[in-house]
Amino acid sequence: MYKDRDTNQRDSRFENQQDGFKKNSNFRFFKRKSCKFCDSGKHPDYKDFDFLKKFITEQGKILPKRITGTSAKHQRRLALEIKRARYMALLPFVKK
């Protein structure tokens, strides 16, 4: 069945590949975002609503940590403080 194929032709397809993996030129290395709270020593506070606005979308949703770059500990605290600020009417629940 495979006797008709030329082995040199089959091997020439893999000449430009290393270890059978094709190099992906579209892959980019991204610098890991650092937590603003860990770097500065500052903690999220519901009274600082101008600073909390940076972590909210235009619709009023809380941005995820993969976008903001905050650590898991500070992301949980940030969400809690945003919810407190909403309850105290310092931040809107929904923006229109």
Swiss-Prot record:
Please list the GO terms describing molecular function: small ribosomal subunit rRNA binding; structural constituent of ribosome
InterPro entries in the cross-refs: Ribosomal_bS18 (IPR001648), Ribosomal_bS18_CS (IPR018275), Ribosomal_bS18_sf (IPR036870)
Keywords of this protein's UniProt record, alphabetized?
Ribonucleoprotein, Ribosomal protein, RNA-binding, rRNA-binding
Instruction: Please provide, in alphabetical order, the Gene Ontology terms of the cellular component aspect for this entry.
Output: cytosolic small ribosomal subunit
Gene Ontology biological-process entries: translation
Record-linked Pfam families: Ribosomal_S18 (PF01084)
Instruction: Fetch the NCBIfam families from UniProt.
Output: S18
What protein family does this chain belong to?
A: Belongs to the bacterial ribosomal protein bS18 family.
Concerning PANTHER family, the annotation shows: 30S RIBOSOMAL PROTEIN S18, SMALL RIBOSOMAL SUBUNIT PROTEIN BS18M
Please describe the quaternary structure of this protein.
Answer: Part of the 30S ribosomal subunit. Forms a tight heterodimer with protein bS6.
Role description: Binds as a heterodimer with protein bS6 to the central domain of the 16S rRNA, where it helps stabilize the platform of the 30S subunit.
What this protein is called in its record is Small ribosomal subunit protein bS18
Q: Which organism is it from?
A: Borreliella burgdorferi (strain ATCC 35210 / DSM 4680 / CIP 102532 / B31)
Gene from which this protein is expressed? rpsR
